[in-house]
C-alpha cells in the first residue's frame, strides 16, 4: 500500500491544508499527517489540539476517508519521519511561484537525503491560494473574521482561544 507523508506545522489547519490533504487522499490510500514540533517555536495550539482539529476537519470534509489518515508528531527531519511511518511519497502543497522555488530546493535536498522518497506537489485550489496559517493567526489575533480561511471547527477554536 502506498503511504504519503504530509508534513507541516498546521498551526492552525487552514482550508489550504485541508484542500491538499483531500487531494492526497484522491491519489493514495493512506496519508500520515506529520505535525512538526519545533523547540524554538511556541505554537498557538498544542500538538493534541492540532491533531484533533485536523481529524475533525477531515471527518467533516470527507467522512468516508477520515480513517485513512493518521496524525503524528515529529521533531526531526521530515524525510526521517516519513520513512519511520512507511511513506514513499512526501506531499507538499503549492500556492504560487514563490512556493515552487522554495519547495523545489527542499525537494532536491530531501532527494539527496532520502532517494527512496518521492516529493509530490499538489496545487492549492484557487480559493485557498492566498491563505497562510501565519496570516490566519495574525488576522484572528487582531479580532478579524477568519471563517473564510479555515474549517468551521478551527474558526471556533481560534475564537475560543483568543476571547478576552
From Swiss-Prot:
Enzyme's top EC category: transferase
Chief localization: cytoplasm
Gene Ontology biological-process annotations: coenzyme A biosynthetic process
Enzyme Commission number(s) from the entry: 2.7.7.3
Domain of life: Bacteria
Residue sites binding substrate per the record: 9, 41, 78, 92
Keyword flag Nucleotidyltransferase: yes
Protein's pathway: Cofactor biosynthesis; coenzyme A biosynthesis; CoA from (R)-pantothenate: step 4/5
Alphabetical list of CDD domains matching this protein: PPAT (cd02163)
Any Gene Ontology CC annotation: cytoplasm
Cofactor: Mg(2+)
Record site feature (Transition state stabilizer), residues: 17
InterPro entries: Cyt_trans-like (IPR004821), PPAT (IPR001980), Rossmann-like_a/b/a_fold (IPR014729)
Gene Ontology molecular function, alphabetical: ATP binding; pantetheine-phosphate adenylyltransferase activity
Annotated NCBIfam families: coaD_prev_kdtB, cyt_tran_rel
Subunit structure, as described in the record: Homohexamer.
Annotated function: Reversibly transfers an adenylyl group from ATP to 4'-phosphopantetheine, yielding dephospho-CoA (dPCoA) and pyrophosphate.
Protein's UniProt name: Phosphopantetheine adenylyltransferase
Record organism: Allorhizobium ampelinum (strain ATCC BAA-846 / DSM 112012 / S4) (Agrobacterium vitis (strain S4))
Lineage of producing organism: Bacteria, Pseudomonadati, Pseudomonadota, Alphaproteobacteria, Hyphomicrobiales
Amino acid at each position: 500500500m502506498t503511504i504519503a507523508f504530509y508534513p507541516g506545522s498546521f498551526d492552525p489547519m487552514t482550508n489550504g491544508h485541508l484542500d491538499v490533504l483531500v487531494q492526497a487522499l484522491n491519489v493514495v490510500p493512506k496519508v500520515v499527517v506529520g505535525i512538526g514540533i519545533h523547540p524554538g517555536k511556541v505554537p498557538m495550539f498544542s500538538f493534541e489540539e492540532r491533531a484533533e482539529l485536523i481529524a475533525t476537519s477531515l471527518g467533516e470534509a470527507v467522512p468516508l476517508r477520515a480513517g485513512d489518515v493518521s496524525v503524528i508528531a515529529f521533531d526531526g527531519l521530515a524525510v526521517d519521519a516519513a520513512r519511520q511511518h512507511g511513506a514513499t511519497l512526501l506531499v507538499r502543497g503549492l500556492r504560487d511561484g514563490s512556493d515552487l522555488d522554495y519547495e523545489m530546493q527542499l525537494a532536491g535536498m530531501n532527494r539527496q537525503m532520502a532517494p527512496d522518497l518521492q516529493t509530490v506537489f499538489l496545487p492549492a485550489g484557487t480559493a485557498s491560494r492566498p491563505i497562510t496559517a501565519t496570516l490566519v493567526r495574525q488576522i484572528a489575533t487582531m479580532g478579524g473574521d477568519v471563517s473564510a480561511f479555515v474549517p468551521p471547527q478551527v474558526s471556533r477554536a481560534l475564537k475560543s482561544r483568543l476571547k478576552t
